[in-house]
Curated annotation (Swiss-Prot):
Keyword Nucleotide-binding: no
Protein name (database record): Sonic hedgehog protein
Organism: Carassius auratus
Residue(s) at site: Involved in cholesterol transfer: 243
The entry's keywords: Autocatalytic cleavage, Calcium, Cell membrane, Developmental protein, Endoplasmic reticulum, Glycoprotein, Golgi apparatus, Hydrolase, Lipoprotein, Membrane, Metal-binding, Palmitate, Protease, Signal, Transferase, Zinc
Signal peptide: 1-23
Residue window of motif Cardin-Weintraub: 32-38
EC number: 3.1.-.-
Length: 418
């Protein structure tokens, strides 16, 4: 019976994706598909994200040198991609050895390089290092780092190559030298390698009764402050958690505003509504990953008069918190700690994500209308379960099948973790 229910929901999902008129979100321009990003080259000595390489917000801590005789040597896999040139100065094949995550990102980057510059290939000058040529605790010793150039060694391309590496999903990219770009990834077992899109449990939302509640305490029947399709504040039904994890420590981005000083804390792959500094028109706002927001952009803050106001982002930094929660409302938006955010993550297209959850909204509307008391009690029992909701897992897997990998945030979703 459960299988039939899932088939029905998948059918409804497919139907919802072609009914574009069902999309809603703050602002009239909100439903427009985002144009392809313009690649902004990295500057010399710039690194992304703007934190130290071996912090949890980047590639994470050093876990120990791997040698050919160590138990962990089996973690390394050779990369024989014909579209990548390996310098291999040592003639040992060591530069081809890397972790699976590093291999996946490198192969993705190789495709981007050929698309960007026809006839040019990606070139790896350093991969796994077994000879001790790097500084102490270098991620090269674990097969988690590569130094790269283009095959034509055209230094004018290296800034753009750095940006392509960021887009390919490397966890830390550094325009380190005039001679190469340094890229690294998280360890395979890192709990931060897949962070999904969540808020810390202590984040506050506003309720229709005038009170506030921590995100972790939301229950069916709650109406929380959100925004409608015209960018007006409304109280929207809380429907479900797409992810509910009380235990895992994760890295969160903190987006802090200037005058008034407010801050919202969310994971890298979560969507936040932003405006460029040149406009205050709410209809021009778009949804961007938290990790892509920059100081000088604007976010939407609820002012003292109860209206949305665009406020400049002053600084961005990272914090670690235990517990993460991803609430979904009927409008697909939510005001958290006085700042407007999307309920969605992983894919940088709020309208598409909102369409994908149309079957969930339909189920909520019908069930709550026909069986209000039973629906709330049954939903309460379901919501207390830890982990990623099965429907979110389904959407994520469908997204990886149907969408270009560059559309999905590299920190995506850990569908097997809580």
């Amino acid at each position: 019976m459960r299988f039939k229910t899932r088939v029905l929901l998948v059918s409804l999902l497919s139907l919802s994706l072609v009914v574009s008129g069902l999309a809603c979100g703050p602002g009239r321009g909100y439903g427009r598909r985002r144009h392809p990003k313009k690649l902004t080259p990295l500057a010399y000595k710039q690194f992304i994200p703007n934190v130290a390489e071996k912090t949890l917000g980047a590639s994470g801590r050093y876990e120990g040198k791997i040698t050919r005789n160590s138990e962990r040597f089996k973690e390394l896999t050779p990369n024989y991609n014909p579209d990548i040139i390996f310098k291999d100065e040592e003639n040992t094949g060591a530069d081809r050895l890397m972790t699976q995550r590093c291999k996946d990102k490198l192969n993705s980057l190789a495709i981007s390089v050929m698309n960007q510059w026809p006839g040019v290939k990606l070139r790896v000058t350093e991969g796994w290092d077994e000879d001790g040529h790097h500084f102490e605790e270098s991620l090269h010793y674990e097969g988690r780092a590569v130094d790269i150039t283009t095959s034509d060694r055209d230094k004018s391309k290296y800034g753009t190559l750095s940006r392509l590496a960021v887009e390919a999903g490397f966890d830390w990219v550094y325009y380190e030298s005039k001679a190469h770009i340094h890229c690294s990834v998280k360890a395979e077992n890192s709990v931060a390698a897949k962070s999904g899109g969540c808020f810390p449990g202590s984040a506050l939302v506003s309720l229709s009764d005038g009170g506030q509640k921590a995100v972790k305490d939301l229950k069916p029947g709650d109406k929380v402050l959100a925004a409608d399709g015209e960018g007006k504040l409304v109280y929207s039904d809380f429907i479900m958690f797409t992810d509910r994890d009380s235990a895992t420590r994760r890295v969160f981005y903190v987006i802090e505003t200037k005058e008034p000083v407010e801050k919202i804390t969310l994971t890298a792959a979560h969507l936040l509504f932003v405006l460029d500094n040149s406009t205050d028109d709410l209809h021009s706002m778009t949804a961007a990953f938290a990790s892509s927001v920059r100081a000088g952009q604007k976010v939407m803050v609820v002012d003292d008069s109860g209206h949305l106001k665009s406020v400049i982002v002053e600084r961005i930094y990272t914090e670690e918190h235990q517990g993460s929660f991803a609430p979904v409302t009927a409008h697909g938006t939510i005001v958290v700690d006085r700042i407007l955010a999307s309920c969605y993550a992983v894919i940088e297209d709020h309208s598409l994500a909102h369409l994908a959850f149309a079957p969930v909204r339909l189920h909520h509307s019908v069930s709550s209308a026909l069986f209000p008391q039973n629906f709330i009690s049954q939903s309460n029992a379901t919501l207390q379960q830890e982990g990623v909701h099965w429907y979110s897992k389904l959407l994520y897997h469908m997204g990886t099948w149907l969408l270009d990998s560059h559309v999905l945030h590299p920190l995506g979703m850990s569908v097997n973790s809580s």
